[in-house]
Design a protein with these regions (language model features):
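Membrane-embedded alpha-helical core segments of multi-pass
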Residues: 79-84, 101-113, 138-148, 164-170, ...
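Transmembrane alpha-helix boundary signature
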Residues: 59-69, 87-93, 111-125
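Alpha-helical transmembrane segments
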Residues: 1-25, 29-30, 57-83, 160-354
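Membrane-interfacial loop-to-helix junctions in multi-pass transporters
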Residues: 129-139, 184
C-alpha cells in the first residue's frame, strides 16, 4: 500500500506545483479559452492545464513503475497526443488534422508495442481470440472513442477532470483486485494528478485543461484498460471504464442522434448537452458538476459490482440503470434542439436574407 500512496502523492504534488507555472506560461503565449456555443464561462481563461496533469502523471509513473514495455508504449503515444493538444490549444487545429493526430497517438502503443484487445471472455462461449485484422482497428477505435468522449464533456469548470478522476479510481480498484500492479499504479497516478488539478479547475476555474488535458485523460484511461485486458479477464477490465464513463458516452450518443434528426452536422457545438439542460433547470455550475460526479460514481460502483454477479443479473441491473438514465435525460430535453446551435442560426440568417 505504501507504493500506491507514494505514487498518488508524487502525482498530486507535481501537478499541484506545476499548474500555476503552466497557467502563467499559457497567459504569456496567448493560449486562452474564449467562450463559444458549448461553453458557459465568461472572459478569457488560460488553458494548457493538461501539461501539469501530464507532468504529474509521467513523473509519478517513471518514479514508481519505471519503464515497463507496455507503459513505455503508452507514454510515447501520450506524449505525441500532448503535442497535438498543445498545437490545438494554441493554434486551433482543423478537426481532420486533430483526428489524424489522435489516430497516430492511438496506433503507437497498438501497432508498435502490441498493446491491443487480443481476446474477450464471453459467457457461455468462453474465450474468443481476435485476429489482428479485427484487434488492431478495434483497439485504435476504443482509444479514440475515449479520447473524444472526455474531450466533449470538457465544457464546465471541473467536469472533465472530476469525471475522469472518478473513472480512474474505479479502474484502479479493479486492477488492484486483480493483482495488476502496473495498471493500478498508473490509475492511482492519474487520480492524484486529477485531484491536484481540480484545486485550480473547480468552479470558479483559474485555468482550463484544454484539449491537451482532456484528450490525455481519455487516452490514459482507455490505453491502460487495454493493457489490463491483455493479462486478465478482458470483459471485466473493458466493462468498468465503459460503465464508469456512461454519462459522457450516453450524452455524446444522444447528441449525435439529436443532431442527425435535426439536420445539424454531428460536430456542430451547441448547448443542449445534459450539463446545459441542468443549468437551464436552474442549477448553478457547481451543482451541475456535483450531479454529474454523483452519476459517474453511481455507474462506477455499479460496474465494480456487476462484474462479480451472474451474467443475466448483471445485464438486468445495467439495462435498468441505463434505461432510467436515458429516460431522465430525455425528460430534461437532451433529444431536442431547445437552444439553436450556431449552425442553425447561420442557416436561419441565410434563409432570411434570401
Amino acid at each position: 500500500m505504501f507504493a500506491y500512496a507514494f505514487t498518488f502523492l508524487v502525482a498530486l504534488a507535481v501537478t499541484f506545483v506545476l499548474t500555476p507555472v503552466v497557467k502563467n506560461f499559457a497567459i504569456r503565449i496567448g493560449a486562452v479559452d474564449k467562450p463559444d456555443a458549448r461553453k458557459v464561462h465568461h472572459g478569457l481563461i488560460p488553458r494548457l492545464g493538461g501539461l501539469a496533469i501530464y507532468a504529474g502523471f509521467m513523473v509519478s509513473v517513471i518514479a514508481t513503475i519505471g519503464f515497463t514495455y507496455e507503459m513505455v508504449g503508452i507514454m510515447v503515444g501520450a506524449t505525441f497526443l500532448i503535442a497535438v493538444g498543445i498545437a490545438d490549444d494554441v493554434y486551433s487545429l482543423p478537426p481532420k488534422v486533430k483526428l489524424l493526430g489522435q489516430i497516430i497517438a492511438a496506433a503507437i502503443p497498438v501497432v508498435i508495442f502490441n498493446i491491443n484487445i487480443e481476446w474477450i471472455d464471453v459467457p457461455r462461449l468462453g474465450i474468443i481470440y481476435l485476429p489482428e485484422i479485427i484487434s488492431l482497428p478495434l483497439t485504435i477505435f476504443w482509444i479514440i472513442g475515449f479520447v473524444n468522449t472526455v474531450n466533449l464533456i470538457d465544457g464546465l469548470d471541473g467536469l472533465a477532470a472530476g469525471i475522469a478522476t472518478i473513472a480512474s479510481i474505479a479502474i484502479a480498484l479493479l486492477a488492484f483486485q486483480m493483482g495488476q500492479w502496473v495498471a493500478a499504479a498508473a490509475m492511482v497516478a492519474m487520480t492524484g494528478a486529477g485531484l491536484a488539478f481540480l484545486q485550480y479547475n473547480f468552479n470558479p476555474a483559474k485555468i482550463f485543461m484544454g484539449d491537451t488535458g482532456s484528450m490525455f485523460l481519455g487516452y490514459i484511461i482507455s490505453a491502460v484498460s487495454v493493457m489490463g485486458s491483455m493479462k486478465t479477464v478482458a470483459t471485466a477490465v473493458l466493462i468498468v471504464p465503459l460503465l464508469a464513463l456512461t454519462v459522457p458516452i450516453t450524452d455524446t450518443l444522444l447528441a449525435i442522434v439529436r443532431r442527425k434528426s435535426s439536420g445539424v452536422p454531428i460536430f456542430s457545438p451547441d448547448k443542449n448537452h445534459l450539463p446545459h439542460r441542468l443549468l437551464a433547470k436552474g442549477l448553478n455550475q457547481k451543482q451541475v458538476v456535483l450531479v454529474m460526479y454523483a452519476l459517474t460514481a453511481f455507474f462506477s460502483c455499479t460496474a465494480l459490482i456487476v462484474i462479480h454477479l451472474s451474467l443475466w443479473i448483471g445485464i438486468a441491473i445495467v439495462a435498468i440503470a441505463l434505461v432510467l438514465f436515458v429516460l431522465w435525460a430525455r425528460k430534461l430535453g437532451v433529444m431536442q434542439e431547445i437552444v439553436p446551435s450556431p449552425y442553425q442560426m447561420e442557416q436561419k440568417k441565410k434563409k432570411d436574407s434570401d
